C-alpha cells in the first residue's frame, strides 16, 4: 500500500538554486508541450504525443535539472489532456503561471537514488544531500518524492512509500455522520464536533497584514517581507485546519467498523454566496477523502449515502418524511406523524446510521 509522509527540508543556497531551476524547467516544459499539443490539435483534430526529450537539443539548459522531474511533468500533462478529451466543455488544460507562488516537482526513486540517512535526504542530480526535519520515521520502499516551496518560503518534501499498514482490530461500533457549518459534524452516537473556525479567528489579523501589503511599493524588499507575513498566516490557518481534520478522521476510524457520510455536492453548495465562505472553511471534501483512504488503510468500511437519500427529512423514529428541514433556519425536526422532537443534524446522523444495517 502507498502512504505519503511530509517533512520540512532545509536546503542550502546551492540546493535552493537547483530547486528553483527544477521548478522553472518543469513549468516551461509543461507549458511548451501544452502549447504544441493545442496547436497540433487545432490543425489536425488529433493529439500530439510529444516528450521532454524533444526539447533538450533546442533548450540545452533543460539538461541541468532532474530528467525525472520533466518526465513527471509530461505525465501530469497527459492526465490533464485525457480529462480534456473526456469532457471538452471545460476547454484545454490551463497553462502554469509564473505568478503562482506554490512551486513543486516530483522525482522517482530509481535503484536507490533517493534515500534518507542521518538527518539528510539524497535526491537525484543533487551533489549533496538535503537536511530534513524527520519528525517521524517510516518503513518501506520509497517510490517517489515531491519537493515543494510554499508562498511563505518554506520547503517541504512529500515522500511516497510502499509499505505494509497494520489493520486495526475489528470493532462492533458503527456511526452515521452529518456534516454542517454550525457544528462541523454531528455523530449518531451523540457526539458533536464544533466548527473550529480557524479562518474566522484570524480574519482581523489577516486583514491588517493584507492592508500593510497593499501599501508597500511593488517590487520593494518591504513588500516581499509583508507578502511573506501574509503567506505565513495563511499557512498557519491551513495547517490548523488539516490538523483538526486528521485528528477527527483518525478518531472516527479507530472507534468504528462502519462509517456512513453524505454524498455532498460541494460545488453546487458553493453557488450559495451566503454560505460559500463557511463551506470552503470547513473542508468537507478533504474530510471525506481522509475517511476514504484511512478506512482502506485500517480495514474499515466507508459507506457513502446515495445523493438522493433524504437524511434530514426522514423521522429517525418512525420513518415519516417531512420537508420542513429544507428551510436551513429550521434547527429542530418535529415529526408530524409521531411527534418526535429532535435536533435536525442528530436526526440526520441517525438516518445515515441506518445505512449500515
Residue ranges of predicted features:
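Acidic carboxylate diad motif detector
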Residues: 50-150
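Gly/serine-rich nucleotide phosphate-binding loop at the start of the catalytic core
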Residues: 1-70
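Positively charged, helix-rich recognition surfaces that bind polyanionic ligands
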Residues: 28, 138, 151-357
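Long, hydrophobic, amphipathic alpha-helical segments used as structural scaffolds
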Residues: 34-41, 81, 85-92, 163
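Generic detection of short hydrophobic beta-strand segments and adjacent strand-loop junctions
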Residues: 7-9, 128-132, 193-195
Amino acid at each position: 500500500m502507498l502512504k505519503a509522509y511530509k517533512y520540512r527540508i532545509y536546503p542550502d543556497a546551492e540546493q535552493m538554486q537547483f530547486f528553483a531551476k527544477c521548478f522553472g524547467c518543469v513549468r516551461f516544459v509543461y507549458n511548451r508541450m501544452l502549447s504544441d499539443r493545442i496547436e497540433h490539435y487545432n490543425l489536425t483534430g488529433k493529439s500530439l504525443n510529444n516528450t521532454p526529450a524533444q526539447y533538450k537539443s533546442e533548450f540545452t539548459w533543460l539538461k541541468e535539472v532532474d530528467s525525472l522531474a520533466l518526465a513527471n511533468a509530461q505525465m501530469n500533462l497527459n492526465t490533464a489532456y485525457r480529462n480534456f478529451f473526456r469532457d471538452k466543455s471545460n476547454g484545454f488544460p490551463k497553462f502554469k503561471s509564473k505568478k503562482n507562488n506554490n512551486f513543486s516537482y516530483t522525482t522517482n526513486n530509481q535503484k536507490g537514488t533517493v534515500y534518507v540517512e542521518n538527518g539528510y535526504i539524497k535526491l537525484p542530480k543533487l551533489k549533496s544531500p538535503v537536511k530534513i526535519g524527520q519528525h517521524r520515521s517510516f518503513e518501506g520502499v520509497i517510490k517517489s518524492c515531491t519537493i515543494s516551496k510554499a508562498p511563505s518560503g518554506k520547503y517541504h518534501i512529500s515522500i511516497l512509500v510502499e509499505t505494509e499498514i497494520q489493520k486495526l482490530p475489528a470493532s462492533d461500533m458503527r456511526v452515521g455522520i452529518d456534516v454542517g457549518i454550525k457544528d462541523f459534524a454531528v455523530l449518531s452516537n451523540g457526539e458533536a464536533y464544533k466548527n473550529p473556525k480557524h479562518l474566522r479567528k484570524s480574519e482581523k489579523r489577516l486583514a491588517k497584514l493584507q492592508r500593510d501589503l497593499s501599501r508597500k511599493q511593488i517590487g520593494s524588499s518591504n513588500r516581499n517581507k509583508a507578502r511573506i507575513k501574509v503567506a505565513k498566516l495563511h499557512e498557519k490557518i491551513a495547517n490548523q485546519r488539516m490538523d483538526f481534520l486528521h485528528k477527527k478522521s483518525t478518531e472516527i476510524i479507530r472507534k468504528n467498523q462502519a462509517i456512513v457520510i453524505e454524498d455532498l455536492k460541494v460545488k453546487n453548495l458553493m453557488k450559495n454566496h451566503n454560505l460559500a465562505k463557511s463551506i470552503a472553511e470547513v473542508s468537507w471534501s478533504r474530510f471525506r477523502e481522509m475517511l476514504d483512504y484511512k478506512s482502506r488503510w485500517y480495514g474499515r468500511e466507508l459507506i457513502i449515502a446515495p445523493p438522493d437519500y433524504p437524511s434530514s427529512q426522514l423521522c429517525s423514529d418512525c420513518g415519516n418524511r417531512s420537508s420542513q428541514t429544507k428551510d436551513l433556519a429550521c434547527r429542530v425536526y418535529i415529526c408530524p406523524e409521531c411527534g418526535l422532537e429532535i435536533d435536525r443534524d442528530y436526526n440526520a446522523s441517525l438516518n445515515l446510521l441506518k445505512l449500515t444495517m
